[in-house]
Amino acid sequence: MASQKPHLNLITIGHVDHGKSTLVGRLLFEHGEIPAHIIEEYRKEAEQKGKATFEFAWVMDRFKEERERGVTIDLAHRKFETDKYYFTLIDAPGHRDFVKNMITGTSQADAAILVISAREGEGVMEQTREHAFLARTLGVPQIVVAINKMDATEPPFSEKRFNEVKADAEKLLKTIGYKDATFVPISGYKGDNVTKPSPNMPWYKGPSLLQALDAFKVPEKPINKPLRVPVEDVYSITGIGTVPVGRVETGVLKPGDKVIFLPADKQGDVKSIEMHHEPLQQAEPGDNIGFNVRGIAKNDIKRGDVCGHLDSPPTVVRAFTAQIVVLNHPSVIAPGYKPVFHVHTAQVACKIDEIVRTLNPKDGTTLKDKPDFIKTGDIAIVKVIPDKPLVIEKVSEIPQLGRFAVRDMGQTVAAGQCIDLEKR
């Protein structure tokens, strides 16, 4: 049973042409849940077009076209299993989507595969550095490096070339703080060393890519952190009372607990908790729950409030300092700019009061102090003042409530995380 295995969110990162899609295709087709009839259709079509080798990249492109044409291939098919785990692949097509998904935590990745091409003239490139730095900054705890296109080295499957690329990648990962990455030579296109050892690389004695993925660790549930339940909705149920609904991000909630909702500043006692219409004696991180609170009326609290225990209440800020990445802004962002910040379930207009400094995306060192403005692609430290009280936490303390997206003009213009705060 798949659901009995621990589940990990896995993100594939790396330069756009280094073979991510091919590798993802290979994993999904060999171990995933793409229905056999779809594979068969592709196989026939590939043969007719003289692509009898059944090129995975081509299949992935078809996959993409079908999605674009609105023939949805359910996201459930982006899952694959190993002996030990059940993985969901968060494939990041574009650089911007990748950063946005990563930062907003809609898909907090538990681990990453960094794909680097071993082909001459490729190797560690600009985007490789940026993706790796962002993965680290945004809290992806563990990484496996897939040194891809080993079939395209000179000569093919060259141990010397593998060692060169590995040395560069190792240096990069050490500078940004990944201590113990595994480096695996593969060919996503030909399938070498993806699921089983390759006869073409007898010199390599390490794990296959799948074995390396199985060596990842399961993240621990943050049950020892203070309780935080961002409110998604509030219902008033006849005969029961006020029932807020939301997902437990950190900590543990039990019937009988004394809780406070902030910034609403309303207190109450938890009478009962339900998940999927079943009573719960204890709610833990990841649980989507409804809970009945005595002493609170439906209109006292709303979406965006956060529930915590009375003795360690959620943090309401007057201002905070954030590290942001500008993803997509048509002009420039200067002090005084006031977009909408999406933090957990809250949406609050916030003013960028000061641009403290910009950072080098490759290593996080300071580029410029107090610049006049920032633009798409920049990483900056900024001071932010919300229009009204807002709950946000330091990413170093409760990362689940420390990340946010910045929206304006119908798009995500930036994303970031809270690194310091001034309590209200």
Swiss-Prot record:
One of its GO terms (molecular function) is GTPase activity. Residues 187-189 are annotated as: G5. Residues 70-74 are annotated as: G2. Signal peptide: none annotated. It is an enzyme of class 3 (hydrolase). It comes from the Archaea. Keywords: Cytoplasm, Elongation factor, GTP-binding, Hydrolase, Magnesium, Metal-binding, Nucleotide-binding, Protein biosynthesis. This is Elongation factor 1-alpha.
